[in-house]
Amino acid sequence: IAGVQGSFDDTDEVERIVENAMTGIAGIRGILVVSGGQAGVGRAFEKLNIQDRPYVIIYDQTPKNERALKSNVVDFLIDQNGYVQGYRPPHILADLLLKGREPEREFWFTDINIKTKYNL
């Protein structure tokens, strides 16, 4: 691990971080972006004219991220089923507070899917 950087969901900041890492740290084989601003990775690669780029992993299956995957800007996309994760907890809480209804079970597990351009 070369380091952990905060980008504040800012594309320009992600671009700067990737540029600095690629020019200042030898042997980078992978980049994981867990925030917004993933487009900064591709912009940094273009600016640096990188031919043999590291593997890139990003989060959230959005149309924009699917395009990045299909166009070989990134290699892997981790989908956490954000709709279910964002919908179910407030629904459970509302049922508990407004209706006094306990959740059906203690834990609700959601899927995590790893996508490549071949299984989109």
Give each language-model segment a name.
Residues 6-63:
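Hydrophobic alpha-helical
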Residues 36, 64, 84-88:
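Conserved active-site and cofactor/substrate-binding residues in soluble primary-metabolism enzymes
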Residues 62-74:
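Flexible loop/hinge segments that line or gate small-molecule binding clefts
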Residues 71-83:
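Short beta-strand elements at the ligand-binding edges of bilobed clamshell
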Residues 81-120:
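Hinge/cleft segment of the Venus flytrap/periplasmic-binding protein
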